[in-house]
Amino acid sequence: MSKAVIVSTARTPLAKSWKGAFNMTHGATLGGHAVQHAIARAGIDPAEVEDVLMGCANPEGATGANIARQIALRAGLPVTVSGATVNRFCSSGLQTIAMASQRIMAGEGEVYVAGGVESISCVQAFPSP
């Protein structure tokens, strides 16, 4: 059984204001920036990434349409790299890290990107029925 290790991390600034600089920045743009820099710091060829797994508590509206795939593309990964969005609400990002490590340990691949994304100001809190 292979061991899974985290070789790089990156995150975007955490904002507490609905009026902040990143207020209306799309989650895929923020996520793409973080993924691009995590891969660069790790010294990994982007083509080596098997899959991008992203947790998202509100995967609808601006963060819908498989935001993990959008992040992969905005991070500059090749179009051959797939993306999967996981919705487990508060534990979505942690779940993707567990899933990526399980896939590595099971021998299903070697390089995965896993994490979470949310741009809550771009998602309506209470959509109309």
Which stretches of residues belong to each language-model region?
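N-terminal amphipathic/basic leader segments beginning at the initiator methionine
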Residues: 1-16
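Flexible glycine-/small-residue-enriched beta->alpha junction loops
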Residues: 2, 105, 109-129
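Active-site/binding-pocket entry motifs
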Residues: 11-13, 77-78, 119
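Phosphate/pyrophosphate-binding loops at sites that engage ATP/ADP/AMP, CoA/4′-phosphopantetheine
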Residues: 37-50
